[in-house]
Amino acid sequence: MMGFRDIIGQEQIIASLKNAVFSAKAAHAYIFDGEKGMGKRTLAYAFARALLCEAPPGERMDSGACGCCHSCIMAESGSHPDIITLVPEKESSIGVDDIRSQVVNDVAIKPYCSERKIYIIPDANLMTEAAENALLKTLEEPPAYTVIILLSENKDRLLPTILSRAVCLPMRALSNEAISDYLVKKGLPEKDNAAVVSFARGNLGKAVMLSESEEFKELLGNIRRTVTGVRDMTDTDINAAAAEAAEKKEERDNILSFLLLWFRDVLFLKAGGDEDRLIFRDEVRELNKAAGNYSFEKINRIIQEIKTARSRLKSNVNAENTFEMLFMMMR
Ligand SMILES: [Zn+2]
């Protein structure tokens, strides 16, 4: 059974949630805030199970719940009647009807078989203002047994009145070492590890997703080929590479991140940095070649240009032209 002990990192949040469970002083509303992949859902279910577990604290160990009482078994099978996960009608937003029918009108009904009733609202930042106002009424006067957990990717999108009535727990970015250790334990070859860790920026879920993604591997392969071969490219080659880089909107930023990390490594090597501390340790030959080919000034200008490209792409300029200019400059 997944419990607190299965969650990597987030020690502070877990400590405060455990404290709420074992002191029997849970708040009526929580906001778990952090980007997708940070483990908000896992944490919410672990907390819900721990709150509803029937075993005395001494028998629960590190997971927060015993794993074998009636409540834990129901929770494990996803059929606990007192753990309610909101499922909105539409995918893109949570409307007032969703909140009314699944939360507001439901809270008055006493827990089915526990001392508490837990509501989990994923993607709470997608609530419409009307939905938030409907929820607010419940948050203002909740029945004693309710605990509402809002999972949010950006708490600033929530009404201040909601924020003021909930305990907000921001998910913390994990250290690169923690993510790297986890990936190694999962059996990911070290070769791709460094790039995945750098791209994940402290988000374990994202790291796992990237490490399993064939698309990401292909993307890395393509951009690697461009960056190492750019000096021999013809104009036609550059056009083709730019078109390819611009093709998938959601991958453009990843490509720029790769280039940025790559040229930082080149700069680091050129400045006499230790090879063991490179991000792309396995590419040291190519990096050394680049360090020999480019001047300090040129590398700095390329790095600057990559940053400019990133802000240009955010303002929706022609992506193909942006990549073309960048690749020309690298050539
Ligand atoms: Zn239990």
Please tell me what each predicted stretch does.
Residues M1-A50, P57, M74, A144-V147, ...:
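Charged, glycine-rich active-site and insertion segments that engage polyanionic ligands
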Residues N133-L150:
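Conserved catalytic/switch belt of AAA+ P-loop NTPases
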Residues I99-R100, L136, L163:
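"Short basic amphipathic alpha-helical interaction patches in structured regions
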Residues M2-A130, A291:
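Clamp-loader machinery-focused feature within the broader ASCE/P-loop NTPase space
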